[in-house]
């Protein structure tokens, strides 16, 4: 511990976000990060606890407390403070294949479990992670390191999201020849087309993919396995197959008027927006235009928030976000103690921008869609919503929602974006391989395992555990790589945590 009194001497400092009214003029990342010396002092705030909950990654009451990757947080925080940036990078990379992604899009489970945050402000671990990886790139020691020896084994990874990339990266490091297939035109999966550019600039993904290519990973884009190439051919050509196709089947809203023109799934809306941005800087007009339109977003999660920010950047007349659940408390409740994940109300970047532009929070809580209202031409013109009440079912103990009679409200809407989550993977890919599914329509495996019901076929990521965070996807990819390696070699020397 380089500075035992650091948490008392230095206040928490984090990057500064650009003013909302300025940042909505562009689609770039909008945080100004601390200078290197100031960031170094933030490392001194880490207490190097005897029991570092920040890296525990344990489940408490169904939620993760601490980093699921078990990042060696106290170690590299101290190395940042002492100026050993390269060693900090080495320790960070030991558990995390892609700190350039997690330092941008992770909700920082580590900080929520930080002991320093129990009676004060937590260590700015996410910002330290960002500084470590970006310094590694600028100093040149994040360069490609191809494996010295090849095993002669071939592995196909289907899907290039965070889980597929993590599995591919580790399997390639082990010496296996890895080919990653991606059905889209660009590598990255969720990272590329599911997360807007202002949260994760796509050049960051391209930068890492270029390194993986130099290390020997082969990427094939525009290829839809199960349609363009049969599963049987893949199983013939490769020793093992890893399914990493994500949970890409969006949950729909079954309400009258659903066939109205102007209703889109959020995933399609965000993909079209990013693709148009990258292809032509929006000149091709191949995105959903929200300029001058009333936009209603169904869903209160991260994807819904991304839709808020994207719609505002295109000049929406109004943006409303519908959330089924009650508003969370502003402060942690007594029955939600540290180190549990704090169930408190958070205002994300898109909602901040809506407040700045429209003068009010876009969220309407405890509500659901009752009807999509069409004009005479079949286009959407309004949405009818109704308020909900939540009560505990005495028989099951679960919360049960009920519509409140007479609480209907009409919202003007020419565009509706459905961000209501996902219901497993696309059926054609699971059918193509004949893998067994569980009751949640995820690919079934034994608990804690990654081998599917089909010989030589493994699964990882959201396709395995259901819709989740990027950090969980990376952990799944690492563990799946270990399982694949063990099945190929009879043992595995991959260090996954």
Please give the residue ranges for each predicted region.
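FAD-site-proximal beta/loop scaffold in flavoenzymes
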Residues: 261-292, 391-467
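C-terminal catalytic lobe of FAD-dependent flavoproteins
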Residues: 4, 12-37, 42-45, 373, ...
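Feature captures the FAD/FMN-dependent oxidoreductase FAD-binding
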Residues: 87, 149, 154-158, 206-255, ...
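Immediate flanking context of iron-sulfur cluster ligation sites
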Residues: 4, 31-61, 85-109
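A conserved FAD-binding loop/helix module that cradles the flavin
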Residues: 304-307, 314, 460-494
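Glycine-rich dinucleotide-binding loop and its adjacent helix/turn
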Residues: 131-149, 207-227, 250-314, 437-453
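Beta1-alpha1 glycine-rich phosphate/pyrophosphate-binding loop at the start
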Residues: 5-32, 41-44, 68-82, 89-92, ...
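Glycine-rich Rossmann-fold phosphate-binding loop(s) that bind the pyrophosphate
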Residues: 159-162, 299-301, 462
């Amino acid at each position: 511990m380089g500075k035992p009194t650091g948490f008392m001497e230095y206040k928490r400092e984090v990057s500064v976000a650009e003013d909302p009214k300025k940042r909505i003029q562009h689609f770039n990342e909008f945080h100004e990060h601390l200078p290197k010396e100031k960031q170094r002092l933030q490392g001194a705030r880490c207490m190097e606890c005897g029991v570092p909950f920040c890296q525990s990654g344990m489940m408490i009451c169904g939620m993760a407390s601490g980093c699921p990757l078990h990042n060696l947080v106290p170690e590299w925080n101290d190395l940042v403070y002492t100026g050993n940036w390269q060693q900090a990078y080495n320790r960070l990379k030991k558990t995390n294949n892609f700190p350039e992604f997690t330092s941008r899009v992770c909700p920082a489970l580590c900080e929520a479990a930080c002991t320093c945050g129990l009676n004060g402000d937590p260590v700015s671990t996410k910002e330290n992670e960002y500084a470590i990886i970006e310094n590694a790139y600028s100093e040149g020691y994040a360069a490609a390191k191809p494996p010295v020896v090849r095993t002669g084994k071939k592995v196909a990874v289907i899907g290039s999201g965070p889980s597929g990339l993590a599995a591919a990266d580790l399997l390639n490091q082990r010496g296996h020849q890895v080919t990653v297939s991606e059905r889209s035109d660009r590598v990255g999966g969720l990272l590329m087309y599911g997360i807007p550019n202002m949260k994760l600039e796509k050049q960051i993904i391209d930068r890492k993919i270029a390194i993986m290519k130099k290390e020997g990973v082969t990427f094939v884009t525009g290829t839809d396995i199960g349609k363009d190439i049969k599963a049987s051919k893949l199983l013939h050509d490769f020793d093992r197959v890893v399914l990493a196709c994500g949970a890409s089947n969006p949950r729909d809203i079954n309400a009258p008027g659903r066939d109205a023109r102007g209703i889109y799934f959020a995933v399609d809306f965000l993909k079209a927006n990013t693709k148009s941005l990258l292809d032509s800087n929006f000149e091709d007009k191949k995105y959903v235009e929200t300029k001058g339109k009333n936009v209603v977003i169904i869903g209160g999660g991260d994807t819904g928030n991304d839709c808020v920010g994207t719609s505002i950047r295109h000049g929406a007349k109004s943006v409303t976000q519908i959330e089924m659940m009650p508003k969370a408390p502003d402060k942690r409740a007594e029955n939600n103690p540290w180190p549990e994940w704090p169930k408190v109300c958070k205002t994300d970047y898109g909602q901040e921008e809506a407040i700045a532009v429209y003068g009010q929070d876009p969220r309407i809580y405890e509500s659901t869609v009752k009807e999509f209202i069409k004009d005479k031409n079949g286009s959407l013109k309004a949405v009818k919503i109704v308020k909900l009440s939540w009560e505990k079912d005495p028989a099951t103990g679960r919360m049960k929602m009920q519509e409140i009679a007479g609480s209907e409200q009409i919202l003007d809407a020419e565009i509706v974006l459905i961000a209501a989550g996902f219901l497993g993977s696309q059926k054609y890919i699971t059918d193509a391989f004949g893998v067994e599914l569980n009751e949640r329509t995820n690919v079934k495996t034994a608990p804690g395992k990654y081998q599917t019901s089909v010989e030589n076929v493994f699964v990882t990521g959201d396709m395995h555990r259901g819709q989740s965070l990027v950090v969980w996807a990376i952990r799944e990819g690492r563990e799946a790589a270990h399982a694949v390696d063990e099945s190929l070699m009879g043992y595995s020397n991959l260090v996954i945590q």
